[in-house]
Amino acid sequence: MFERLFRKKRFKYKCDECQEYHVGSPSFSMKHPTSFFDVPETERNDRVQYNDDLCMITPRENDTTEDPIYYIRCILEIPIKGASEPFMWGVWITQSKENFERYIETFEANQSNEKSSGWLLVDLPFYNNARTGEPLTHLECEVHWGPKGQRPKVSLWENSHQLAVD
């Protein structure tokens, strides 16, 4: 009886894309970092290098005030009350040039003992508190790189932003 009462439920949802029901928590992923869209389409071929896991955005050729921005794609897990699996956000976290290069160098290896810090630009549905025209919130986080073949996981530093609270 106690097992039935206290067992966590498996989440079930209907996929909008395939119209099928899936068991397990849903996830949502950002295909590109938000700043990708700040680069005009006509300049993206020259200024943006990316794949499914990495992104580097360089400043305009004559811009000496900006540095390149380095991103790695990570997983941010949000627990769902009463569910056995978390909701997962696929997010892009900024990295220093040194950490970005180290991540690339060790990409094909087990990175379980590796970690770095970075920033999450909060442009996620339900969590973006910025008004139109205001800058987006940046949340500091720790990136746990993880086993070979798995995306790194992110833990946000403690703060009062709702995403960190969740």
Write out the residue ranges for each language-model feature.
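Basic, glycine-/proline-tolerant helical and adjacent loop/strand elements
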Residues: 2-83
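Helix N-terminus capping/helix-initiation residues
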Residues: 33, 96, 163-166
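Charged, low-complexity intrinsically disordered segments
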Residues: 39, 64, 82, 88-90, ...
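Elongated scaffolding segments in large macromolecular assemblies
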Residues: 80-119
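C-terminal, charged low-complexity interaction regions
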Residues: 105-166
